[in-house]
Every structure is written in C-alpha cells, then in structure tokens.
Amino acid sequence: MEKKYWSGSQTKHRVKYHIVWTPKYRKRILDGKLAERLKELLEECIEVNRWAMDEISIQKDHIHLLIQFVPSISISEMVQILKGGTSRVIREEFPELKEFLWGSSLWADGYFVESVGSFEENIIQKYIQNQ
C-alpha cells in the first residue's frame, strides 16, 4: 500500500524509513509458523495505526521493513509499538521460545533505521525483496 503524499489538516508529507531489527541474541528463530504469525501481527499493527508498509522481509535472524508513517510520532515510538506488541503476542503463542530467550522480550534492544528518498525507494525495495 503505497501513498505518494499524505495530508494532515495543515501538512503534506512523505516520510519513509527502512528499519531492521533482530531477535535477542540474534537467534535464528523467525521462520515457519512464527514468521507467518509475525507478519500478520506487523500488518495488523500497521493497519490499526494507519501507517503504510511498502515492503517486508522476515529472515531467520532479522526483519527488514519499508514503512511510511505520520511525522507526529517519533521513529523510536513507532519501533516500540511494533516491537512491543509483537513481542508480547509471539511469546504468548509460542511458549517454546522460553528455551532460547530469557527475560521479557523477544527483540534485541536496538534497531537500524535510515530515511528513504524517492530516488532510493526502488533500490531499497529490491534489496528487501532479495533478502
């Protein structure tokens, strides 16, 4: 779902980000039914918040996401919403993860983020698709 420009009551904007994050200890656990459920949860979260996801790739040990959202929230707030919501549900639905992950989080603390301009967008989309 791509949007060229979004409009607010007094704003017009187009802000896209390439975000990457990993499970705790970079464990290779994001596959099969867990990866499918994770994708569903991310899509739901993005839809509920009225953001737009242009591309996603879930690898065994990391996630790539190309996302557009309103600039009224910070990048760190957006990442916290995605990671926090998915962590809780995935840990509840896949209790066998306790064997690999200690503590109360599925995700490592940090993340990578870069802004994506119009010129770079197709390059980033192809990169994510080819992961």
Where are these regions (language model features)?
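Basic nucleic-acid-binding interfaces
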Residues: 1-131
